[in-house]
């Protein structure tokens, strides 16, 4: 029996989908434990780019079972479209995908509430993706939400109506101009619910328990990144779920002592989409070049990501919070061609150098302290072994390992699953 965990260590978009895809053949079960369709996992192979929003990244592998855990929130409409997109590739979704009855449903009115709430904030917007994630988790913690298991109940529509009516009253309270046709949205929602019923619903915590007893190997897949965690992220510019390792336990019903390896994924630089503090953000041509070469546009929102140098203060913090045992560095190829690279090793926080991640990293409080490295000019995308990598990149990697005290086991040198170097 093996239970391993894979998660992002920055503000999301680290490349988790590709690594899950690379590792999937080693596992019987791939289980998503938090988040919703606000984040996309991008996989690229055979010249085709695939973006998964709710479905685990193991869906492309014939032998793996994919679980959507209780910590996930599901928009039936988005979910149906995702399934339809996958079925074009002749994937047998029904036999490979199962859903926890305890996963919460995103209603059309959750999305409208999200839009109304964000609009009401004016300049204080937090950069919500407007997918209804926050309002759905609010209903979950407020004990008002609807869950997948409720679909099986005879009075599901009555439960839906009661909650939707509450939402409409809240939308009116915000007193902002939002155009929508709820009848049309609800028609689409209930059609998608009928499609959702065709899949298998399970008591996922019992399923996971029995799988462990049977000696199955399980990979728990996180969405977004650790710095977006509702507790440990850059609050309030965070998501509404626990994106850290603890979220795998609460989002799947797995005991903490069952988890063996914790794989931490990070980019060789840093990106962030939307609002929020970002100490190493670049506002010059270097940052623009990173975004262009790295194709840094959100897979779900299409928004351009903000780019900056690698931040070891934030990375060490994420490693500590998650108990990371192995690191995987993504997009090393994007840094090819830069004469000089920088890595943030400390923050100057209110006039004093510190090496820990403080409560407030707003720019008026924090200035990054950098160490410079000589860049490399070689194209990495065709390299297949660690020995082939340029000496400057090896120095960069080894410095990171020394600073964070965790080994880097994988270096990604391109988007395709084949462009993955094992160290």
Segment roles from a protein language model:
Residues 1-423:
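Non-transmembrane, aqueous-exposed alpha-helical and coiled segments at domain scale
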């Amino acid at each position: 029996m093996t239970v391993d965990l894979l998660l992002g260590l920055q503000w999301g978009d680290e490349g988790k989908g590709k690594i899950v895809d690379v590792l999937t053949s080693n596992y019987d079960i791939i289980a998503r434990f938090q988040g919703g369709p606000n984040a996309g996992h991008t996989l690229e192979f055979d010249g085709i780019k695939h973006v998964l929003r709710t479905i685990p990244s193991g869906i492309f592998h014939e032998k793996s079972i994919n679980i959507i855990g209780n910590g996930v929130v599901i928009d039936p409409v988005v979910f149906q479209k995702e399934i339809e997109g996958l079925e074009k590739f002749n994937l047998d979704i029904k036999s490979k995908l199962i859903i926890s009855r305890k996963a919460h449903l995103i209603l059309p009115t959750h999305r409208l509430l999200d839009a109304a709430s964000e609009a009401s904030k004016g300049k204080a917007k937090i950069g919500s993706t407007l997918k209804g994630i926050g309002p759905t988790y609010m209903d979950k913690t407020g004990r008002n939400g609807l869950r997948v298991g409720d679909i099986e109940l005879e009075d599901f529509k009555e439960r839906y109506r009661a909650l939707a009516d509450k939402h409409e009253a809240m939308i009116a309270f915000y007193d902002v101009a939002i155009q929508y046709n709820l009848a049309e949205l609800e028609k689409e929602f209930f059609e998608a619910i009928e499609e959702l019923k065709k899949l298998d619903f399970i008591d996922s915590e019992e399923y996971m328990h029995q799988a462990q007893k049977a000696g199955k190997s399980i990979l728990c897949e996180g969405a977004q990144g650790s710095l977006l965690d509702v507790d440990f992220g850059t609050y309030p510019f965070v998501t509404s779920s626990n994106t850290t390792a603890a979220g795998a336990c609460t989002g799947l019903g797995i005991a903490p002592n069952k988890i063996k390896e914790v794989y931490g994924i990070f980019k060789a630089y840093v990106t962030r989409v939307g609002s929020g503090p970002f100490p190493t953000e670049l506002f010059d041509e270097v940052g623009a070049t990173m975004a262009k070469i790295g194709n840094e546009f959100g897979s779900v929102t299409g928004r351009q990501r903000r780019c900056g140098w690698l931040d070891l203060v934030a990375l060490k913090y994420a490693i500590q919070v998650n108990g990371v045992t192995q690191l995987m560095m993504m997009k090393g190829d994007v840094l090819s061609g830069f004469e000089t690279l920088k890595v943030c090793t400390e923050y100057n926080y209110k006039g004093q150098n510190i090496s820990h991640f403080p409560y407030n990293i707003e720019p008026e409080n924090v200035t990054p302290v950098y160490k410079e490295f000589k860049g490399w000019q070689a194209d990495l995308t065709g390299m297949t072994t660690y020995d082939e990598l340029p000496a400057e990149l090896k120095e960069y990697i080894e410095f990171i390992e020394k600073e964070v005290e965790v080994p880097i086991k994988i270096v990604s040198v391109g988007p395709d699953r084949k462009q993955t170097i094992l160290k």
